Amino acid sequence: MFARVFKAMPARASALTSVNASIQARFMATVRQQRTAHERATFTIRDGPIFHGKSFGARTNISGEAVFTTSLVGYPESLTDPSYRGQILVFTQPLIGNYGVPSAERDQHGLLKYFESPNLQAAGVVVADVAEQYSHWTAVESLGEWCAREGVPAISGVDTRAIVTYLREQGSSLARITVGEEYDADQDEAFTDPEQIHLVRQVSTKAPFHVSAADPQCHVAVIDCGVKENILRSLVSRGASITVFPFDYPIHKVAHHFDGVFISNGPGDPTHCQETTYHLRRLMETSQVPIFGICLGHQLLALAAGARTIKLKYGNRAHNIPALDLSTGRCHITSQNHGYAVDASTLPSDWKPYFVNLNDSSNEGMIHKSRPIFSTQFHPEAKGGPLDSSYLFDIYIDSVKKYKASQAAFHPQRDSLPSPLLVDLLAKERVGVQPTIGMQNIAAAATAAAAAA
């Protein structure tokens, strides 16, 4: 009996091998058919090299600032990060798209679980190779399908190492992606410089909205310059109910209704946000409220304090950048995405550097010497990326709670005080957590919820 079984095994193995080979052949034929169906695309750097490849996104032409990221994972988060607004993102990772694109599922707070904003923010995508067959339990579509649906052109089959080498040596440059067209050297007007555009105005919420914590212990005002969903989640998950305001909202006029103020990340040149800088300066002059800023928020806080910002040659965009905590001597691996930095030598005497970049010695944070105000250039919320510095949110929330306790004698009913809105409420906001409600309605909603419970 066993002899017959063992004798039959080679034949069965041979048949199984034949079936596997047939399946593999059909799979590869499908891949080749999909690849050959792609239209020609060109990635052109202004006054620089031209790269030819295949289009796998939207059939449209786009121009912007070409920048690169060395992040190995997290392309859904990177591409939906509002800080990439107006930029053509070049990935150094050789293969992108292998785990597809997840759904727009939301968590218990009503925040997006897998994206940093509802839309794809990058102007264009450049990769060496794109995975057309994806596999992940959260995936609902391919990277190419997502780019096409969002109207974002994407190109594959180009030498990204050569592109990054050029950008590293020459600096971030204007570039464009053209689909199905030849490059015309005389059409320089086709290059659009996003630095000349007020990008923050495009990505900031148009009206205030509120996100409640499950067990609210404090109330934080968030200045939205292009805030990432995981920043909001990092605050709410620590017991902070938040009200998110447009970037140009006069926050100093309503700060007395809040226990803390947070300044978010965002795209572009910080000097474009003059209204925000002015309001922050007035806030620090008129209030002792704790303040925390991240990325662009760090730069805006520095400008409000009287420091200057500089444009970096090619920026820092990665998930593995070392930043040294100057107060403890500890080194953190950080996630970063910025093209500007604070000139630490211009900090006023009542401020001091908090973190420093160990790669290029650029400033990575600052802290006030006597007040609960600090900021970081890197992203402590880091999705995707390392969480070495996520404790900074704990430090901030602790200072917010202490401030709230210190104000209890002066404002015993702080949580129920209405706060007048100084802008018209619109029906649609960037994050879309819930229908926009005025601050004057938040207390009523909270009272109704408590009565129902």
Curated annotation (Swiss-Prot):
**One GO cellular component term:** mitochondrial matrix
Q: Where does the transit peptide start and end?
A: 1-28
The protein's role, per its UniProt record: Small subunit of the arginine-specific carbamoyl phosphate synthase (CPSase). CPSase catalyzes the formation of carbamoyl phosphate from the ammonia moiety of glutamine, carbonate, and phosphate donated by ATP, the first step of the arginine biosynthetic pathway. The small subunit (glutamine amidotransferase) binds and cleaves glutamine to supply the large subunit with the substrate ammonia.
Q: In which pathway does it act?
A: Amino-acid biosynthesis; L-arginine biosynthesis; carbamoyl phosphate from bicarbonate: step 1/1
- Per the UniProt record, the source organism is Neosartorya fischeri (strain ATCC 1020 / DSM 3700 / CBS 544.65 / FGSC A1164 / JCM 1740 / NRRL 181 / WB 181) (Aspergillus fischerianus)
Q: What is its EC number?
A: 6.3.5.5
Family designation: Belongs to the CarA family.
Report which reactions are catalysed by this protein.
hydrogencarbonate + L-glutamine + 2 ATP + H2O = carbamoyl phosphate + L-glutamate + 2 ADP + phosphate + 2 H(+)
EC main class here is ligase
Keywords attached to this entry? Amino-acid biosynthesis, Arginine biosynthesis, ATP-binding, Glutamine amidotransferase, Ligase, Mitochondrion, Nucleotide-binding, Transit peptide
Q: Which residues form the Glutamine amidotransferase type-1 domain?
A: 219-406
Molecular function (GO) terms for this protein are: ATP binding; carbamoyl-phosphate synthase (glutamine-hydrolyzing) activity; glutaminase activity
Task: Tell me the active site.
Answer: 295, 379, 381
Q: Where in the cell is it found?
A: Mitochondrion matrix
- GO biological process per UniProt: 'de novo' pyrimidine nucleobase biosynthetic process; glutamine metabolic process; L-arginine biosynthetic process; pyrimidine nucleotide biosynthetic process
Q: How does this protein assemble?
A: Heterodimer composed of 2 chains; the small (or glutamine) chain promotes the hydrolysis of glutamine to ammonia, which is used by the large (or ammonia) chain to synthesize carbamoyl phosphate.
* Name of the featured protein: Carbamoyl phosphate synthase arginine-specific small chain
